Amino acid sequence: MKQLLLILAFLLPLCAYPQLKEPFNGLEITSDNPWTGDLDCFVIETGWLVSRADPTRKSVSIETPLVYSATMEWEFEIRMDFKPSDQNHIRLHVYLDDQRMLGLKNDYYVQIGSNKKTITFRKHTATEKNPKILIEKALDVLLGAVDLKVKLTLENHKIWNLYVLEKGRFVLIGSCESEVSSSCKGGQLRFECRYSKTRVNDFACNYIIISDNISIEPEKPDTPEEPEEPNEPDEPLVLPRLLAIQPITE
């Protein structure tokens, strides 16, 4: 029994260790992971990946390889020093479901920012013009400059849950079902900044952690307890009348 416990104690940390951990605190963007793409449009500043892009372009991005599994978790922190919009926002492309045999390609991504001040989880099929919004939530934090931590989970190739950090705890903001193919073994994780000419710089990412295991389930929003229905008043207790005792007469 002791040997079994020792083996489990050794294996559990290995199972829980993330497959990708990017702190963005090295000398180069590629110090910890093999990022490719528009590397010349980003710099590392005090532990943040920060955009320094070309104003004539509408978007820049970097990407790194990722292995897919049935159950996954993505966690990351982003910052924008301005109010995001439809033109100026951040996307993290988390899963590219490339089913080549069927000619299907679905790009799943989290978008932080829109004209409606929302965070969304979207699915964009290559053959369609517009993405499908799977989860959408308006957040007060998106009314101005943004610093936000986000968590996304995938369960059994199908169930997606999106969380944001509020007051020190991850809170569920939405769930959906959208099945991905088990035959797709991996793809590219892509961090993308979309911008107008006046908002080229100061998109930033602090860290990205991706695991094949879902951490302890974050707390869900508090729901007000339904008031208990008042109990019906008990019927008054009726005592039997005592019979008058008559004196015995001879």
What residue spans do the PLM features occupy?
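Secretory/extracellular carbohydrate-interaction modules
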Residues: 52-120
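Carbohydrate-binding surfaces in secreted/extracellular proteins
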Residues: 24, 76, 143-177
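Extracellular glycan-recognition surfaces and repeat-rich motifs
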Residues: 27-55
